[in-house]
From Swiss-Prot:
A single MF term (Gene Ontology): ATP-dependent protein folding chaperone
GO cellular component: cytoplasm
Name of the protein: Heat shock protein 70 1
Keyword flag Magnesium: no
């Protein structure tokens, strides 16, 4: 029996499970609860984790930390982090561009990273498993939202390491939930089935489209919002009641963190009640300045307060259907995961979207993710149960990955929704003569220009022997491991010089806002992007043509066979074109094309003589690399790598 566990590290609650005797056991904590609040509290005497931390939150708001998952792997100046900080009763400070949490612990000021806070929650889950299983637990599979980016995944893995865990694998929450749904189904021999996992938790939202066939779970597409969940619905209720309190009593309770915490706890309770009742009352004694706050709210009012948030959950559903190229009628089951899917309005929206099809509620929305992670942990540690035999998980990369080539173009090596693990290599070359090195800049995102995407990291490959532009061959390899974490390497074929980089979160990384903006804007800006791509192709085409003509014109037989005046006018035209290009980096497609026609006219006249005399140019045929990269040589902006078709 393996001692490996599956841990669902949630924004608001976490859960741990273990696969034993052909079944999954969800492990209850010391309070007897099967889920544990992702809360850590610091007092004058001790550190509390889980239920104990959450229970004292109102008395100690400034030193009770929660929602670390909303900060992990993000930059401090990320607008979402800034927005969250407004709601947090604890202090978030900036160190090295990243958010850190500042608390008072045992009488001194301490600063923790989000990874450290998450690692404390993981430690609690590890101890919960150890007390149940007897003995040490080190191997774990930890889940993350499918839409978590590279840096958030890496940071989550780091949190596991800090907690003393050997992180076997980072897997996506919806995929783990799909295992929970499909594990019992694989014996039924239903053939291939498309299922949609709709996972709306406390702080994150994911939608994944999978096909399940005889134990093979293949993710077709994934989308989501790493910053939408039950917490946001609670916030709407808190604001609603705070405003009501202000209207009734002319007092602003939002200045008092303790009152806010008590109100938030009451709101969370009211929200849950509204999933089963049409209305509920909120009663808080001595909420603020001795005032008892008694009020009520109906389900309809709650739905209206969160209307835009509820509706926004359908955008990723539409996106995965588009990306997966499936029709609504081809989805066999819609599986709801995450506590927030208990909200009747959410269920109705999903059902209406799929033309009245009822969502499947056969799995426990709070436990499904940990359940699937436990199954994966058992498989990875060599469990031989008949249940887990032949179970194969094929997940995907949520965002396209590529490098910047000349002209600031995003050259994608791995498109979004590519099955992982995956490895892809492409050959690039230098951009100017005798260039000694290239700068490889790695980006993620969906836009055509790298400036609109997210820079993951960069490295220099130097020591390239002097050679004309386009001659050295630089092979760039992207390798995404099964955790969705990227390694990039580059090797110069001639010398065998190589350089590699694991993209970790040295660079504070992407927010859901940016990711979502990228994909949403990518649709909107697709036309602009295409226009820009055509413009750069025209510019690069003209430049390659001018240089290949220049090479032809410098050859001996050209000088021997072509009339001197024609040679002179061609050389003059080439030099003029090259200098015009240097000064007109942002001309239009038409201007580049006109310039090329002009040059072609002069060139054809001279080349006629050459061909008539039987000389064929030994250099590259005029035309160069079609669609090759291009900031003009000598222009120092941007990288100096050129794509070779």
């Amino acid at each position: 029996m393996s001692k490996a566990v599956g841990i669902d590290l949630g924004t608001t609650y976490s859960c741990v499970a273990h696969f034993v005797n052909d079944r999954v056991e969800i492990i209850a904590n010391d309070q007897g609860n099967r889920t544990t609040p992702s809360f850590v509290a610091f007092t004058d005497t001790e550190r509390l984790i889980g239920d104990a931390a959450k229970n004292q939150a109102a008395m100690n708001p400034a030193n009770t930390v929660f929602d670390a998952k909303r900060l992990i792997g993000r930059k401090f100046d990320d607008p979402e982090v800034q927005n969250d900080i407004k709601h947090f009763p604890f202090k978030v400070v900036e160190k090295g561009g990243k958010p850190h949490i500042q608390v008072e612990f045992k009488g001194e000021t301490k600063v923790f990273t989000p990874e450290e806070i998450s690692s404390m929650v993981l430690t609690k889950m590890k101890e919960t498993a150890e007390s149940y299983m007897g003995g040490k637990v080190t191997d774990a599979v930890i889940t993350v939202p499918a839409y978590f980016n590279d840096s958030q995944r890496q940071a989550t893995k780091d949190a596991g390491l800090i907690a003393g865990l050997n992180v076997l694998r980072i897997i996506n929450e919806p995929t783990a939930a799909a295992i929970a749904y499909g594990l019992d189904k694989k014996e039924q021999g239903k053939g291939e089935q498309n299922i949609l996992i709709f996972d709306l938790g406390g702080g994150t939202f994911d939608v994944s489209l999978l096909s399940i066939d005889e134990g093979i779970f293949e993710v077709k597409a994934t989308a989501g919002d790493t910053h939408l969940g039950g917490e946001d619905f609670d916030n709407r209720l808190v604001n609603h009641f705070a405003n009501e309190f202000k209207r009734k009593y002319k007092k602003d309770l939002t200045t008092n963190q303790r009152a806010l915490r008590r109100l938030r706890t009451a709101c969370e309770r009211a929200k849950r009640t509204l999933s089963s009742s049409a209305q509920t009352s909120v009663e808080i004694d001595s909420l603020y300045e001795g005032i008892d706050f008694y009020t009520s709210i109906t389900r309809a009012r709650f739905e209206e307060l969160c209307q835009d948030l509820f509706r926004s959950t359908l955008d990723p559903v539409e996106k995965v259907m588009r990306d997966g190229k499936l029709d609504k009628s081809q989805v066999a089951e819609i599986v709801l995961v995450g506590g927030s899917t208990r909200i009747p309005k959410i269920q109705k929206l999903v059902s209406d979207f799929f033309n009245g099809k009822e969502p499947n509620k056969s799995i426990n929305p709070d436990e499904a993710v940990a359940y699937g992670a436990a199954v994966q942990a058992a498989i990875l540690t060599g469990d031989t149960s008949s249940k887990t035999q032949d179970l194969l998980l094929l997940d995907v990369a949520p965002l396209s990955l590529g490098i910047e080539t000349a002209g600031g173009v995003m050259t994608k090596l791995i498109p979004r929704n590519t099955t992982i693990p995956t490895k892809k290599s492409e050959i690039f070359s230098t951009y100017s003569d005798n260039q000694p090195g290239v700068l490889i800049q790695v980006y993620e995102g969906e836009r055509a220009k790298t400036k609109d995407n997210n820079l993951l990291g960069k490295f220099e490959l130097s020591g390239i022997p002097p050679a004309p532009r386009g001659v050295p061959q630089i092979e760039v390899t992207f390798d995404i491991d099964a955790n969705g974490i990227l390694n990039v390497s580059a090797v110069e074929k001639g010398t065998g010089k190589s350089q590699k980089i694991t993209i970790t979160n040295d660079k504070g990384r992407l927010s859901k806002e940016e990711i979502d903006r990228m994909v949403a804007e990518a649709e909107k800006y697709k036309e602009e992007d295409e226009k820009e791509a055509a413009r750069i192709a025209a510019k690069n085409g003209l430049e390659s043509y001018a240089y290949s003509l220049k090479q032809t014109a410098s050859e001996k037989q050209f000088e021997e066979k072509v009339d001197a005046s024609k040679r002179e006018s061609l050389n003059k035209a080439i030099e003029e074109t090259i200098s015009w290009l240097d000064n007109n980096q942002s001309a239009t497609t038409d201007e580049y094309e006109d310039k090329r026609k002009e040059l072609e006219g002069i060139a054809n006249d001279a080349l006629k003589d050459l061909y008539a005399a039987g000389g064929v140019p030994g250099g590259a045929a005029p035309g160069g690399f079609p669609g090759a990269g291009g900031a003009a040589p000598g222009a120092d902006q941007g990288p100096s790598v050129e794509e070779v078709d």
